[in-house]
From Swiss-Prot:
The EC number(s) this enzyme carries: 3.4.14.9
PTM section of the record: Activated by autocatalytic proteolytical processing.
Cofactor requirement: Ca(2+)
Record protein name field: Tripeptidyl-peptidase 1
Residues carrying a glycan: 53, 205, 216, 280, 307, 438
Native organism taxonomy: Eukaryota, Metazoa, Chordata, Craniata, Vertebrata
Disruption phenotype: Morpholino knockdown of the protein in embryos results in developmental defects from 48 hours post-fertilization onwards, including reduced eye and head size, a curved body, small jaw, and loss of the swim bladder.
One GO process term, biological-process aspect: neurogenesis
Biological source species: Danio rerio (Zebrafish)
One Pfam family it belongs to: Pro-kuma_activ
Catalytic reaction(s) noted: Release of an N-terminal tripeptide from a polypeptide, but also has endopeptidase activity
Keyword annotations of the record: Autocatalytic cleavage, Calcium, Disulfide bond, Glycoprotein, Hydrolase, Lysosome, Metal-binding, Protease, Serine protease, Signal, Zymogen
Gene (UniProt): tpp1
Active site: 266 (charge relay system), 270 (charge relay system), 470 (charge relay system)
Length: 557
């Protein structure tokens, strides 16, 4: 039997083509090499099949997201999205025949039929994907199977696939976008009394009555790798900080496997602050540690969303990676998945990152800024960060110097933001040199919130001075959930993909942040300074931070 499989496999090996030639296959320094994986060990690979009607879906998303369109808010069901995007019969047949020819039979798909997840031995995987060589790596208690060399597929299959998941991508070195910035920041900013739900609700003008009441409303956070929240931490947090407003102290639903280890500070932060800003609203937690050593947790989360007909309306995610560490094929395909979520009326919020404009060292003499993905996707709403100008009281906000922002090197600037971004580029006198950024790329963030010096309860311990855009993102997500709540009570649809409407509002309902810059490359040309805030939109804080009553009124039609 193995001989027959080999003969069939040999036929398919002729004239292979690289599928993700630009994918960074470098092993991050914090992962330890354990050696080659045995040929009979199993891997699970995810095959992203080419979809149909991508341009049509893009046009439909513009229509359902544009408040001036007669189709505004007329979202599609998952089945309707699946009917549009499903791969062609030829694509399905070619890919399935290719897999069967290698003896790969243990496969399952999802409702949209555009992803195939298949279990096979390493021996078969390496024959299927010439050039791949799987090794085992470890970090703390986590192990992964990955190939550090480029892979190809047969030329007849190449045109039918976007990428194969589970081959190259390591989890991001920082795990997710933000970290609890203790250490040096704690020593400098230790005098701050700290941001709590009461501070958030006061600053953004949320009253005790501004809580959820609609039965059909819901919101969610996503967690990856060893990031888990503990129910006891949430209950303790609400006991300490939830006075003065009606709230829930338990998560409605956990999707995935909730680990039994120590709570992660990021996971605690996400859950505690989406549930205190979007108070009294049903909250889900998507937890994706990866069931198999070869799985990619972020990709598994995307597949879950594509396979569930009923999901929360607002999702906040504090995850990101450098654009230049990912293949364009992968990013373009994930971008389409965000587009499909928008067609369903789902709001996807991503943290902008905690590295300012970032910095990539190209040569000894040349640096550029380093945009982050998915923050740079034109089909998500990206949230930046701010600090109080006066750390002792509720004062106006300035930029948080770590707040991520900039211009994509992969995605062109979408129509909805062209006027705002061009106005910024024309009006600001102290821009960084244009060799550092792409003036025609998707610019982010879109808006912001406080991201500095939060109180969090993790492992039953109250922890101060936690900072990052993983704090601001769930706060904005909760506020959008409150607006959805009011819309549902009036018979209006969910906000969905909010960016086209947000840019048409031109900052209405948002506090404009005009003071401060964020960090970037430490060289003699920019000297650590990236972009700076300015009146109207800017690539540090977007349009600004929420003024809830005005923001709500602006979004209630």
């Amino acid at each position: 039997m193995r001989v027959a499989v080999f003969v069939l496999s040999f036929i398919w090996l002729v004239n292979g083509e690289l599928l993700e030639a630009d994918q960074d296959a470098v092993v991050p320094g914090d992962w330890t090499f354990l050696g080659r994986v045995g040929p009979l060990e199993e891997v699970e690979l995810t095959f992203a099949l080419k979809q149909q009607n991508v341009s049509k879906m893009e046009e439909l998303l513009k229509l359902v997201s544009d408040p001036d369109s007669h189709q505004y808010g007329k979202y599609l069901s998952l089945d309707e999205v699946a009917a549009l995007s499903r791969p062609s019969p030829l694509t399905e047949k070619v890919v399935e025949n290719w897999l069967r020819s290698h003896g790969v039979m243990d496969c399952h798909t999802i409702i949209t039929r555009d992803f195939l997840q298949c279990v096979m031995t390493v021996e078969v995987a390496e024959a299927l994907l010439p050039g791949s060589k799987f090794h085992r790596f470890s970090k703390n208690t986590k192990t992964l199977l990955r190939s550090t060399s480029q892979y190809s597929v047969h030329e007849d299959v190449h045109q039918h696939l976007d990428f194969v998941g589970g081959v190259h991508r390591f989890p991001q070195k920082r795990k997710i976008v933000s970290k609890g910035w203790e250490g040096a920041r704690q020593a400098i900013l230790g005098y701050h009394l700290g941001v709590t739900p009461a501070v958030i609700r006061n600053r953004y003008n949320l009253t005790a009555k501004d809580v959820g009441t609609a039965a059909n409303n819901s919101q969610a956070v996503a967690q990856f790798l060893e990031q888990y929240y503990h129910p006891a931490d949430l209950a303790e947090f609400m006991s300490l900080f939830g006075g003065g407003f009606t709230h829930m102290s338990t998560v409605e639903r956990v999707v995935g496997t909730q680990g039994g280890g120590k709570a992660g500070i990021e996971a605690s932060l996400d859950v505690e602050y989406i549930m205190s800003s979007g108070a009294n609203i049903s909250t889900w937690v998507f937890t994706n540690p990866g069931r198999h050593e070869s799985q990619e947790p972020f990709l598994q989360w995307m597949l879950l969303l594509s396979n569930m007909s009923a999901v929360p309306w607002v999702h906040t995610i504090s995850y990101g990676d450098d654009e230049d560490s990912l293949s364009e094929a992968y990013m373009n395909r994930i971008n389409i998945e965000f587009m499909k979520a928008g067609l369903r009326g789902i709001s996807m919020l991503f943290a902008s990152g905690d590295s300012g404009a970032g910095c990539r060292h190209l040569t000894k003499e040349r640096n550029t800024f380093r945009p982050s993905f998915p923050a740079s996707s034109p089909y998500v709403t990206t949230v930046g960060g701010t600090s109080f100008q006066n750390p002792f009281k509720l004062s106006y906000e300035v930029t948080d110097y770590i707040s991520g922002g900039g211009f994509s090197n992969v995605f062109p600037m979408p129509d909805y933001q062209v006027d705002a971004v061009r106005a910024y580029l024309k009006s600001v006198q102290s821009l960084p040199p244009q060799t550092y950024f792409n003036t025609t790329g998707r610019a982010y963030p879109d808006l912001a919130a406080l991201s500095d010096n939060y109180w969090v309860v993790s492992n039953r311990v109250p922890i101060p001075w936690v900072s990052g855009t993983s704090a601001s993102t769930p706060v904005v997500g909760g506020i959008l959930s409150l607006i959805n709540d009011q819309r549902f009570l009036k018979g209006l649809p969910a906000l969905g993909f909010i960016n086209p409407r947000l840019y048409k509002m031109q900052g209405k309902g948002l506090y404009d942040v005009t003071v401060g810059c964020h960090l970037s490359c430490l060289d003699d040309k920019v000297e650590g300074k990236g972009f700076c805030a300015s009146p109207s939109w800017d690539p540090v804080t977007g349009w600004g931070t929420p003024n809830y009553p005005v923001f709500l009124a602006s979004l209630m039609d």
